[in-house]
Swiss-Prot record:
Binding positions (Zn(2+)): H94, H96
One BP annotation, GO: monosaccharide metabolic process
Lineage of the species this protein comes from: Bacteria, Pseudomonadati, Pseudomonadota, Gammaproteobacteria, Enterobacterales
Gene Ontology terms for molecular function: methylthioribulose 1-phosphate dehydratase activity; zinc ion binding
Catalyzed reactions per annotation: 5-(methylsulfanyl)-D-ribulose 1-phosphate = 5-methylsulfanyl-2,3-dioxopentyl phosphate + H2O
Any Pfam family matching the protein: Aldolase_II
Name of the protein: Methylthioribulose-1-phosphate dehydratase
Keyword annotations from UniProtKB, A to Z: Amino-acid biosynthesis, Lyase, Metal-binding, Methionine biosynthesis, Zinc
Cofactor: Zn(2+)
Main enzyme class: lyase
Gene, per the UniProt record: mtnB
Pathway annotation: Amino-acid biosynthesis; L-methionine biosynthesis via salvage pathway; L-methionine from S-methyl-5-thio-alpha-D-ribose 1-phosphate: step 2/6
Domain of life: Bacteria
Family per record: Belongs to the aldolase class II family. MtnB subfamily.
Keyword Metal-binding: yes
Length: 204
């Protein structure tokens, strides 16, 4: 797909995310890799359900510099980190859904284990419900550079797959193209809802 087609696909995904209620009150941020040096990131404070092409800002991946001087998402550094770590990644989606936010708080360990669900196969490379998928959880931090450093240290020891959670904050997930990132988001959100319901029922 061309750059313009990918951007249109990302806009469509953003509007769909808005309809799902996964980025309330202008929360969340989305991005698209352009090349090895640049990406597009959503401007700060924009409602994700009504984004237009002008709401994406050009960002230099190595430095987070924005040539236009406008203000990108405060969490731009996490998007650019993912692009630097994994050259194959083409799009990153960050959402604030209720299920992701709550699960990231009730799970006390540093990873959410998903196992036994057929929908694990919505995640690239997963072929069976018998495997375990671990979604790392990082404690929230308003200092994004410090949070990015912790994510980078984890990724150096254990490569990230599909996404990670920030505790009490939300989900970051990605894909090689927008379509794959969107599928991973939808699959993970389904799995989060299943896992949350399972825990609630088992607690009764």
């Amino acid at each position: 797909m061309t750059e313009n087609q990918q951007l249109k696909a990302l806009l469509s995904a953003c509007h769909w995310i808005g309809e799902k209620g996964w980025c309330p009150a202008t929360g969340g941020n989305m991005s698209l890799r352009l090349d090895d040096q640049h990406c597009l990131v959503t401007e700060s404070g924009k409602d994700k359900g009504s984004l237009t092409e002008t709401d994406f800002l050009l960002v230099e991946t190595a430095s987070n510099h924005v040539p236009s001087g406008r203000t990108p998402s405060a969490e731009t550094g996490l998007h650019t980190l993912i692009y630097r770590l994994y050259p194959q990644i083409g799009a990153v989606l960050h959402t604030h859904s209720v299920n992701a936010t709550v699960l990231s708080r009730v799970e006390r360990s540093d990873g959410l284990v998903l196992q036994g669900y057929e929908m694990q196969k919505s995640l690239g490379g997963q072929t069976t419900h018998l495997d375990s998928v671990v979604i790392p959880i990082f404690d929230n931090d308003q200092d994004i550079s410090r949070l990015a450093a912790r994510v980078a240290a984890h990724a150096e020891a254990t490569p990230l797959q599909y996404g990670f959670l920030v505790r009490g904050h939300g989900l970051y997930c990605w894909g090689r193209q927008v379509a794959e990132a969107r599928r991973h988001l939808e699959g993970l959100e389904f799995l989060f809802q299943c896992e949350l319901q399972r825990r609630l029922l088992e607690a009764k």
